Amino acid sequence: MSDKSIEGLIKRLASTSPNPDYLDDENALKCCRLALDACEQGNYGVAALLLNERREVVAQAENRVFSQGYNSSAHAEMILIDQLEQGSLGHSPAQLTMLVSLEPCPMCLSRLLLSGIGSVRFIANDSDGGMISRLNSYPPAWRNLVQLQNHYRAHVSEPVLKIAEDLAAMNLANLRHKLFMHIGS
């Protein structure tokens, strides 16, 4: 059984090397390191990378929902889309791929569809909040947009997948409590 504490995840990340048999392992590990930083800062353990056609990182972000009080839009994907839309990245959206450590939520996926980013890859499934696995639940106009973007699971090794899953689950009960305290439920 793997250690799912912050210290355990730090050790697991440090001892996990990218497996060359898995196309996304190297960038997925970079993404997981960012997600770990988000956890250490008291945020959800989620991060995202924007990759060019050569799979080089052109921008990166981590979840910052609780970094400065509360910002519901400070998901990693949203931060990167903001940078892209401000023109600060200098890349055509259609040529980019977003690699996310956790399946995007409905808010992020809707924004991704409108961004023009060519492809979205995610490392870990989000059975409670992920939207890519529920694409058919979108209204018809949104389903048309879905056809303009590629969506798929990242090609990662089992150790990298488990790290991403454990990061996404890190301190989840406490984070949900903070969220509900903020929204008054």
Question: Where are the predicted features?
Answer:
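Glycine/small-residue-rich phosphate/adenosyl-binding loop
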Residues: 59-60, 76-91
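Short beta->alpha transition motifs characteristic of CBS
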Residues: 56-65
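A short helix-loop-beta-strand connector motif used in the catalytic cores of GNAT acetyltransferases and
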Residues: 40-46
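Short beta-strand scaffold segments in enzyme catalytic cores
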Residues: 46-52
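Short, ordered coil/turn segments that flank beta-strands lining enzyme active or ligand-binding pockets
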Residues: 41, 53-54
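A short, polar/charged loop-to-alpha-helix boundary motif
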Residues: 65-79
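Immediate flanking context of iron-sulfur cluster ligation sites
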Residues: 90-102
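Zinc-dependent deaminase
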Residues: 1-38, 104, 111-185
